[in-house]
Amino acid sequence: MESSVPLGNSVRTGAACGRIMAVPSKAAQGDARARWKLLGQALRKERLDDSLQKVSVRRFNSFRLFSVVEMKEIKREADCQTWFQYTCVFCPQYSLCLRHNSGISNVADILTSFDNTGNVCVWPSEEVMAYYCLKHKDIFRGLAVCELGGGMTCLAGLMVAISADVKEVLLTDGNEKAIKNVSDIIRRPQNEEMFKDRLVSSRVLRWDNETDVSQLEGHFDIVICADCLFLDQYRACLVDAIKRLLKPSGKAMVFAPPRGNTLSQFCNLAEAAGFSIQRHENYDEHISNFHSKLKEKEAAVYDENLHYPFLLVLCKTR
């Protein structure tokens, strides 16, 4: 009898993969039980046990590159969404009003919507990419820019939109709820003033949807993307989407942690698709220094394999 393991919308079997499924170690079984308990507490909206935080990817949630202040003058949304003022600590002239979850997500949405990871929080890689784009805003001057998989805030793409003398910024995600939220953020009066005469828009874009990709083929000078490499079933689609969205002379900037071998697998697929890749581990002095301090002083919560994003720069070679 074949063993089967569900992965998103697909099922992988031991025979189909050409390998015997290994029996999980006791440590792995213990982590799995802890994750189920963590999920149960989250669904019951209980305070999470400190002992369970070690199995949560979100136990580390920020490189502290942005100050985040709740905008209490704006009425809290009924679905646990709250407006916050995001201001870059190192470039305080750049600030935006963002809305995202401040409580437990709706369970029905989690179970029925397409890839809800971007609706959970602003992930560290997105935060780092937003900061990096602000520090290097001149590279976007006069260009058409697209953010892929930006979640419910598209923080990095929005920071490009308010800081760079950019021609166009398109903010995308595969989740409809995420893009509805991004659209509301764009239309927020305080934010609209920051965009000036720049073209800033949002739309649902699934990398595996031919119509979504073909409508924008060859349109962008730069594609940016953060922490979108971990889903096995969409990794090849992401590579294909990036290649097709870019102009012949275009490039992509991808920020992502290793997460086992997922980063390497993405690089292999990208090279096979005709990209040259520059891989940077130390691309910003402040982030590198903070990374070193985290490894030394916060090892209980900080795992560089899960949390420290590398920078990949992809350029077309064919």
UniProtKB/Swiss-Prot annotation:
<dbReference type="InterPro" id="IPR019410">
    <property type="entry name" value="Methyltransf_16"/>
</dbReference>
<keyword id="KW-0949">S-adenosyl-L-methionine</keyword>
<dbReference type="GO" id="GO:0005737">
    <property type="term" value="C:cytoplasm"/>
</dbReference>
<dbReference type="GO" id="GO:0005634">
    <property type="term" value="C:nucleus"/>
</dbReference>
<protein>
    <recommendedName>
        <fullName>Calmodulin-lysine N-methyltransferase</fullName>
        <ecNumber>2.1.1.60</ecNumber>
    </recommendedName>
</protein>
<dbReference type="InterPro" id="IPR029063">
    <property type="entry name" value="SAM-dependent_MTases_sf"/>
</dbReference>
<dbReference type="GO" id="GO:0018025">
    <property type="term" value="F:calmodulin-lysine N-methyltransferase activity"/>
</dbReference>
<dbReference type="Pfam" id="PF10294">
    <property type="entry name" value="Methyltransf_16"/>
</dbReference>
<keyword id="KW-0963">Cytoplasm</keyword>
<keyword id="KW-0808">Transferase</keyword>
<dbReference type="InterPro" id="IPR025800">
    <property type="entry name" value="CaM-Lys-N-MeTrfase"/>
</dbReference>
<comment type="function">
    <text>Catalyzes the trimethylation of 'Lys-116' in calmodulin.</text>
</comment>
<keyword id="KW-0489">Methyltransferase</keyword>
<keyword id="KW-0539">Nucleus</keyword>
<comment type="similarity">
    <text>Belongs to the class I-like SAM-binding methyltransferase superfamily. CLNMT methyltransferase family.</text>
</comment>
<comment type="subunit">
    <text>Monomer.</text>
</comment>
<dbReference type="GO" id="GO:0032259">
    <property type="term" value="P:methylation"/>
</dbReference>
